Amino acid sequence: MFVGFLLMTLAASSIFAATAAEPRARDLGVPFEGSPGTLNAITDVAGVSVGQVTLVEDLADGNKVRTGVTAILPRGRGSFDTPVFGGWFALNGNGEMTGTAWLEESGQLEGPVMLTNTHSVGVVRDAVIAERVRAGGADASGYWWSLPVVAETWDGHLNDINGFHVKPEHAAQALSDAKDGPVAEGNVGGGTGMVCHEFKCGIGTASRRVAAEGQGYTVGALVQANYGVRDTLRIAGVPVGQHLREDRVYTDLALAVAGEQPGGDTGSIIVVIATDAPLLPHQLKRLAKRAGMGLARMGSYAGNGSGDIFIAFSTANAAAAAGAAVNQAQFVGNDHLDTLFEATVQATEEAIVNAMVAARDMRGEDGHYAKALPHAELVKLLKRYGRYERSR
């Protein structure tokens, strides 16, 4: 059992938090391919739960806290007890996802996937181990060990990232609060201070229902989006970034120093893919790779300064991953993976747009400001390009 903590630093956490009840991309008429699950969220994959802690505070010393933690538990409360098969892929490795050496070697994800800011990876990693020890997961012999998976993106434009405001109790609370059902998006959890294509962004999620080998399966995606420049942004094929040119965070010509052009894509994105389709670790690595195509649809080119790192896991084959001496696992044949690949691309793309739509304007550290994607202007562009689809 996870131990909850009283979070004294969450006094203003509701100011910028977008809730799952607010409009999503489809509500604005953005057309997407594929059939979503009931919630159109990663939690459509049975057993997956998500917990988030959002930290927003204006400190007395003038610094601004705009950060948090997101926890994805593949098997809910049983995630520490029963691993899942998993695989990962770095499209561009200017970032961090701990625990991937053992994930690559073993093919198993043991415990949750945690998302936070770049300079809080260590404290979150340690907190996950501490929670497992506290829950009785440690071997009494003293030889038990854990290599948690913690991934990051940089929120230092809006957040006092060097103030180290994420504490162990925040990671513990994200784990304790994890639940199924709708997932809050936008300025929440690890995505609180993130910026995407120079619009305010954060956490987003989506899902797809597909058939493979005559069976129905679900693929879900959750993103912590913090990548991209405005010029390349495309939504449903519409060159949105070429039209909405105001309030750019990084590439406005007014930001140029000594006549030099402002910087390019220096952000990052973490994509978490979940499925109930029975897949082996090497197949899940193939699935993770397809997340990059969802980014490409959005206009990402995976710039040198961007950490684009993806992880995929399957909740199937629980018995095979339980640690017996000899195990049997089912898996979808390689010739039948295409629908799952396509679903991954579609869900990743929609999750990113959902993150942008849910986010709200935010002012943060040093007065820095990130404007959210303007809904009305997006709808106008969709109609102009014949891509508007009335929500049902």
Question: Language-model features: where?
Answer:
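Bacterial N-terminal signal peptides
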Residues: 3-14
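Alpha/propeptide regions of enzymes that mature by internal proteolysis
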Residues: 18-392
